[in-house]
Amino acid sequence: MVDLSFNATVFMQMFHFLLMLVVLRLFAYRPLMNVIEQRQAYIADEIEAAEKQKAAAAELRSQLEADLAKAREEAKAIVARATKASDEQAQAIMEQARTEAQRLKEEALAEIGREREKAIAQLKDEVASLAVLVAAKVVKDGLTIDAQHNLVQNAIKEVGQLQ
């Protein structure tokens, strides 16, 4: 059978157990809980700082990508302007060359025209001189038709020799 007698050691053990719980709570659990709370706060701060750095890095990346795209567009614009300027310069040079060639051609044609006029004038003078000589011989000699024919042939030969 079971003995249900009252034993004071049980109460003393319960008292010591409760006293030990109070002492542990005051001196062990509270500092341990403070350390755990500090560690949790530190970890939370580190996570928050990492998220901020990640957001800053993403913002910096998007900024750099935007700057790179802008730089590429500026480079394309510079290349386009340079290409356009070189095309315009090439067109200007070609137009200047055409103008100069046209001017030289016109000068050459004018010079040829002057030389032609000079040659024609000189030829007219020679023909006039020959005509005067022929007329003088015809008048002086009173030539026959055959003699006149021979005289004209000789004059033509002389003109051929002058050229």
UniProtKB/Swiss-Prot annotation:
Named from the GO MF annotations, one term is: proton-transporting ATPase activity, rotational mechanism
Work out whether the entry's keyword set contains Transport: yes
Topology of the protein relative to the lipid bilayer: Single-pass membrane protein
> Per the UniProt record, which residue ranges are transmembrane?
10-29
Q: Where in the cell is it found?
A: Cell membrane
**What does the subunit comment say?**
F-type ATPases have 2 components, F(1) - the catalytic core - and F(0) - the membrane proton channel. F(1) has five subunits: alpha(3), beta(3), gamma(1), delta(1), epsilon(1). F(0) has three main subunits: a(1), b(2) and c(10-14). The alpha and beta chains form an alternating ring which encloses part of the gamma chain. F(1) is attached to F(0) by a central stalk formed by the gamma and epsilon chains, while a peripheral stalk is formed by the delta and b chains.
UniProt protein name: ATP synthase subunit b
Q: Which organism is it from?
A: Desulforudis audaxviator (strain MP104C)
